[in-house]
């Protein structure tokens, strides 16, 4: 009965949304496009989510934490897919495929493979014990307050990093489509997050996530079909876009061999060589460059120079590295960026393109390391694993994972198609155009977000060359309809889908953090006699506080969305995967072993990120060497083995678990 009612309700909702899109399209054709379309596509869905959240409000403890454990498997799979398909997937993944080609398939393969691990290794056993949170599961398995506290801290850390990435995505969407400042867009998005989760907890989040999945999947399938038909690929290009790949490969070869392109790349190499000279002359070059800026600013002020130039020099001086050590980090990054732009275009179809085996091997290692981290991180994310506690039974949890994979596959089969089509549009319609006739979308995006796209005439010939286009991956999806020449209503649809992806994941993460604080720390460690009503109230207050703090951190714009997501996966894998797997499948795992494994994995992962990621190196002035050339986004490849090794060794050296613990593991292992 419940399933039939849900199918009827969400079918009507889907038809209503598609009719809403068609209506706006007709209005645009009749009255013309404008920023009002962006407002409508952002605020009308938020209003719908608010209504669902209001109707799902509850103060019942089981409803608030796990939606009453009565969510049908198909709908839980849809909600989990929405929880999973974050701003990084929607905004960043197609951009990474566009920029790096084959290398970005690590995200698709890693994330999809992770759900196989969820199905076979964890979801049924987590559901069998039927706890409210993952720290609750581990605290019960090891009968330890220390394990619970440590797991709660790790869940808060990895979820918070992931949450910041989602809120940054919301800020980017609001900035582009309603024209507000990035920070204001973030706090507008905060309201959207809270209306979905504040009143109803997991119950409200579940039903809003189902609604959000319908919007986000429509927002990827419809534009892909429209752009494909424009390129002669038909309305379902997911299984037949090889012809377009051949056209892209041919144009990439032309760009690679073009003399003008080589002149542009030579210009970047000369700029990189100049920066290398400055690096070689440190610290003298630091004092010289800083002195030059100070002298220029003083001269402009003395001669009443233009306010714009004075402001530019003041900003440059404020952003100048604080000491020679920080200058080395910043200038090294600038040199590397120039050298990357000086490289020939990366062929989309070719695995690990490189001039030699010495260049290819690090790329292969990083591909495998990232794939591994994403797979293990997927199987360890608390906000994903907790979703399977909302199903009606262990068997339903297994079926729910299958539905999750199906709904995610609908999205992931479309993303590579979009990346290929947008790359073809850029190569065919932007490269080779005169600078005097740049498309409107280039100037508009550069006006709103100059860091996302820039086209500079490096060799002064008045023609746009591939190497002169600097386009951040995060803008590829949001700008796709404009790049392909589609109506602005399709851009609004993309914005609604991106917002749905960011909100759905942000809601799940926010609830995970608030529940870890209220249930695992407040209830189990501070006030075990607290009433159910008080526990729900505390969770709501904490949810509001965490949302405000995460929005503030996101407004600082601390890193690329895709990097923040990758870091969250590495943190989750390093802290949770060893102890979850050992806790379920090895009775010999002890409390001390679990604590040692979690601490070791987390410390190794955090150290590697902080010591090798340029943003942190700039903050601290310390830049450590990479291990085996592995990038910081894949730090979990070191944290997970360290966590397993330490947990196993300490458990073997410790006393065996008692009879109760062994019986509990047997109970968990027979779902």
Language-model segments: which ranges?
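Membrane-embedded helix-loop-helix hairpins and adjacent transmembrane boundary segments
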Residues: 1-671
């Amino acid at each position: 009965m419940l399933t039939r009612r849900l199918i009827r309700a969400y079918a009507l909702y889907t038809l209503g949304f598609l009719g809403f899109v068609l209506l706006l399209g007709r209005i645009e054709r009749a009255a013309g496009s404008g920023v009002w379309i962006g407002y409508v596509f952002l605020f009308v869905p938020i209003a719908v989510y608010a209504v669902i959240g209001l109707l799902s409000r509850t103060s019942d403890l089981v409803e608030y934490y796990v939606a009453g454990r009565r969510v049908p498997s198909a709908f839980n799979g849809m909600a989990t897919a929405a929880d999973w398909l974050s701003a990084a997937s929607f905004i960043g993944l197609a951009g990474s495929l566009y920029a790096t080609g084959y290398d970005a398939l690590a995200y698709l393969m890693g994330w999809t493979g992770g759900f196989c691990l969820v199905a076979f290794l964890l979801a049924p056993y987590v559901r069998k014990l039927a706890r409210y949170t993952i720290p609750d599961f581990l605290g019960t398995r090891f009968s330890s307050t220390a394990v619970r506290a440590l797991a709660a801290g790790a869940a808060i850390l990895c979820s918070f990093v992931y949450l910041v990435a989602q809120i940054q995505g919301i800020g980017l969407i609001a900035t582009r489509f309603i024209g507000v400042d990035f920070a204001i867009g973030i706090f507008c998005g905060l309201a959207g997050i809270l209306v979905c989760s504040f009143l109803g907890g997991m119950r409200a989040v579940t039903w809003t996530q189902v609604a959000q999945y319908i919007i986000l999947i429509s927002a990827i399938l419809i534009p892909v079909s429209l752009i494909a038909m424009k390129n002669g690929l038909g309305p379902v290009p997911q299984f037949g876009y090889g012809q377009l790949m051949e056209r892209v490969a041919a144009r990439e070869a032309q760009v690679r061999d073009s003399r003008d392109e080589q002149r542009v790349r030579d210009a970047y190499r000369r700029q990189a060589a100049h920066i290398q000279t400055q690096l070689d002359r440190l610290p003298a070059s630091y004092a010289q460059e800083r002195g030059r800026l100070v002298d220029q600013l003083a001269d402009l002020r003395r001669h009443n120079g233009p306010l714009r130039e004075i402001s530019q020099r003041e900003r440059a001086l404020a952003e100048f590295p604080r000491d020679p050590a920080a200058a080395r980090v910043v200038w090294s990054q600038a040199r590397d960026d120039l050298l990357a732009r000086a490289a020939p275009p990366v062929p989309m179809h070719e695995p690990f393109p490189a001039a030699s085996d010495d260049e290819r091997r690090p790329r292969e290692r990083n591909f495998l390391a990232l794939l591994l981290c994403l797979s293990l991180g997927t199987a360890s994310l608390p906000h994903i694993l907790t979703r399977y506690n909302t199903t009606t039974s262990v068997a339903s949890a297994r079926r729910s994972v299958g539905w999750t994979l199906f709904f995610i596959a609908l999205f992931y089969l479309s993303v590579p198609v979009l990346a290929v089509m947008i790359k073809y549009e850029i190569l065919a319609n932007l490269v080779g155009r005169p600078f005097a006739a740049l498309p409107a979308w280039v100037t508009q995006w550069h006006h709103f977000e100059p860091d996302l796209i820039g086209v500079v005439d490096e060799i002064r010939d008045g023609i746009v060359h591939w190497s002169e286009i600097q386009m951040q991956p995060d803008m590829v999806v949001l700008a796709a309809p404009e790049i392909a020449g589609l109506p602005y209503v399709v851009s609004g649809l993309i914005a609604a889908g991106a917002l749905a992806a960011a909100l759905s994941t942000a809601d799940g993460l926010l609830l995970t953090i608030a529940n870890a604080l209220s249930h695992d720390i407040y209830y189990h460690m501070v006030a075990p006699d607290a009433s159910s009503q008080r526990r729900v109230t505390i969770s709501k207050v904490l949810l509001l506080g965490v949302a405000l703090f995460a929005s503030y951190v996101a407004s600082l714009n601390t890193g690329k969305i895709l990097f923040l997501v990758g870091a969250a996966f590495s943190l989750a894998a390093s802290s949770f995967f060893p102890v979850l797997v050992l806790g379920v499948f090895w009775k010999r795992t002890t409390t001390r072993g679990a604590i040692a494994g979690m601490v070791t994995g987390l410390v190794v992962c955090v150290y590697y990120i902080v010591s090798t990621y340029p943003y942190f190196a700039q903050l601290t002035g310390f830049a450590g060497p990479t291990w085996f050339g592995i990038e910081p986004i894949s730090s979990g490849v070191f944290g997970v083995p360290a966590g397993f090794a330490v947990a196993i060794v300490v458990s073997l050296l410790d006393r065996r678990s008692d009879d109760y613990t062994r019986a509990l593991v047997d109970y968990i292992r027979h779902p």
